[in-house]
Amino acid sequence: MLTLPSSPDFRLDNQRALVTGGSRGIGFAAAVALARAGAQVWIAARNAGQLSEAAGLAAQDGLRLQTLELDITDTAQVRQRLGALPDFNILVNSAGLARHQPFLEVSEENYDAVMALNLRATFFLSQQVARRMKAGGIAGSIIHISSQMGHVGGPERSVYCASKFALEGLTKTMALELGEAGIRVNTLCPTFIATELSRASLSDPEFSRYVLDNIKLRRLGTLEDVMGPVVFLASPAAALITGAALLVDGGWTAT
């Protein structure tokens, strides 16, 4: 017999969310989107001034973003400061670093810096949050902000690509191990998004042309393009999605 299905639920009321790298760019946009969907949101970053600015801007829209000054590469600090907070239902790992050089010129310093933030810090912060989700019986959602560069190569992006490919592998393993606890783990993989971080690279006409030639929709991504997918992956509407990569790349990886 035909029955009418219920509509998917995109609301996040009574959910607690932590967004790393939440004072700028994609992280800030993700935090705003989650707050607008009803979540109680903490934004984490190292710079107290930037955190205050982000929270103040959100407040002008009637949103409350709680701030957490945190260096996520410091695992002892992560344990201490997260220990003083309630358990989270949602984690968005948006903190990241890119240092672009030709492969033959990459220094150990730049390699270590990118891997320390993009992979190691994300790994151990996620471990802390997931342990508490499992212990508290929370069927949570962990979203790693990865990149299209976790699926393709890119010139002068050997270390960045390596960190994001590794993050994709980590996501699948986390999904396998945490699924029985009801914890979902996915990546959101944007193309080039118009932010402060990307402005310098995209100001090069040759590089900008390369980017737009590869984005099939022939435009850069915007922060708004990322906000909906973040809410979707965090929400009950994505209840059966785990171990997946949601590509928000304008078709870059389609070929």
Question: What annotation goes with each model-predicted range?
Answer:
Residues 102-103, 107-115, 211:
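Substrate-binding pocket helix/loop in short-chain dehydrogenase/reductase
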Residues 16, 23-25:
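Conserved glycine-rich cofactor-binding loop
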Residues 131, 176-180, 239:
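Alpha-helical segment proximal to the catalytic Tyr-Lys
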Residues 104, 152-158, 180-181, 218, ...:
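Active-site loop immediately N-terminal to the catalytic Tyr-X3-Lys motif
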Residues 147:
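Residue(s) in the substrate-gating loop at a strand-loop-helix junction
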